Amino acid sequence: KKDGYIVDSNGCAPECFPTNXGC
């Protein structure tokens, strides 16, 4: 998860998809 992003129920920001790298 990246601080400062709205996250989904998994704690990942939409901007992280599809690779989730930043989560």
Swiss-Prot record:
What is the tissue localization of expression for this protein?
Expressed by the venom gland.
List the disulfide bonds in this chain: none
List the PROSITE patterns: LCN_CSAB
One GO cellular component term, please give it: extracellular region
Report keywords, A-Z. Answer: Disulfide bond, Ion channel impairing toxin, Neurotoxin, Secreted, Toxin, Voltage-gated sodium channel impairing toxin
Q: PTM comment for this protein?
A: Contains 4 disulfide bonds.
Function of the molecule: Excitatory insect toxins induce a spastic paralysis. They bind voltage-independently at site-4 of sodium channels (Nav) and shift the voltage of activation toward more negative potentials thereby affecting sodium channel activation and promoting spontaneous and repetitive firing. Is lethal to mice. Is about 1% of the total protein in the venom.
Q: What is this protein called?
A: Toxin Acra2
